[in-house]
């Protein structure tokens, strides 16, 4: 495994990544569900914002609210900032930090493809995986959800999305006060392999949220959410049991010949 210090300059691959992030919309099928679970005045934390695909969806849903897009990686953040500017997302604030269980400095590992370009979608904190032939690394700042809420003096937090390659449980540990106080809805990408690399286990993430009164759901065809009984890899929506959305029919309502999403 080759480990290199982070160094970046504009290249053809950067322009390709930027063009893709600017002109394409991933996760389009989730837009109706996000619109139902993220009110127009919502405050949203998009953690691991990457190149802004979810950020764009949240910005449209919370068009009278505020989206905080957390992205510690310099390469991804340079794309994210440009996407936010080009799309005129004035309700988005890009935050150059990672979120975890405590405030500190850590190492962000960015896989390098055989072409030499960054596999920045798989960037993660901590030790590099042996599956990669070469990686770049940079030092980044880590803080907590609770710390950000206190610093910004937020009086609400409606939604947290986190896709941070195994650090999701660490994020939850740093958000305990916020989860209890604001009961935000969550969208988490959970991988047993990635969580193990971070020193955690998949079942622990589900148990942590269940103990705090959250119910797990999974997106299914037809833009509906189905309850989940057991821990597994995938993208999961966690909704507080007392939240009406946890017991509502979350399938989109169709009227006459109105087109679907």
Which residue ranges define each predicted feature?
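Phosphate/nucleotide-binding beta-alpha loop and adjacent structural elements of enzyme active sites
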Residues: 1-261
